[in-house]
Swiss-Prot record:
One of its GO terms (cellular component) is ribonucleoprotein complex. InterPro entries: Ribosomal_uL16 (IPR047873), Ribosomal_uL16_arc (IPR022981), Ribosomal_uL16_CS_euk_arc (IPR018255), Ribosomal_uL16_dom (IPR016180), Ribosomal_uL16_euk_arch (IPR001197), Ribosomal_uL16_sf (IPR036920). The lineage of its organism: Archaea, Thermoproteota, Thermoprotei, Thermoproteales, Thermoproteaceae. PROSITE patterns: RIBOSOMAL_L10E. One of its GO terms (biological process) is translation. This is Large ribosomal subunit protein uL16.
Amino acid sequence: MPVRPARCYRRIKGPPYTREEYIHGAPMIQIPKFDMGTTSAAARATFPMVAKLIVEERGQIRMQALEAARQMASKYLTKYVGDANYYLRLNVIPHHVLRENRMLAMAGADRLQEGMRLAFGSPAGRAARVEPGQILFYAEFKPEHLAHIKEAFRRAASKLPLPTRIVIEPKGDGDGKTATQG
């Protein structure tokens, strides 16, 4: 069956549905990598700048959208910056299991099936629940690659169903503070 459009799952309705031990047939998380680029601590210490893609509205982002955004950003940065010159992390994990009450969708199906009110549905996918101000993507880089990082995040944001913003700042000193905060 085809995948329903993202507008069907963008808004949060009800409590999270995450307990896999009670869900039979829950789909696997189809995001193979959460860390891209240079992942060694020694190499990351040479990157003085940080970029964050931050979500502005509460909602759900399906794992297909997260994977598409991750691929867009990673491929662009690999092509124009090189794997050794950046670190990129996808910060959210799609734990919430989406349900779908499948209905017949063909000519004359209205006479065959009327459905059921408030039907529970069967597992159909996964999504990450996000809140305003939550970081979706985190990147470390050198100042000369700032334009490429912004473009990669812009391309990744075009694959997501919620509005986002890009924040660029100097890397902190390890205790959660940035260099400009003192």
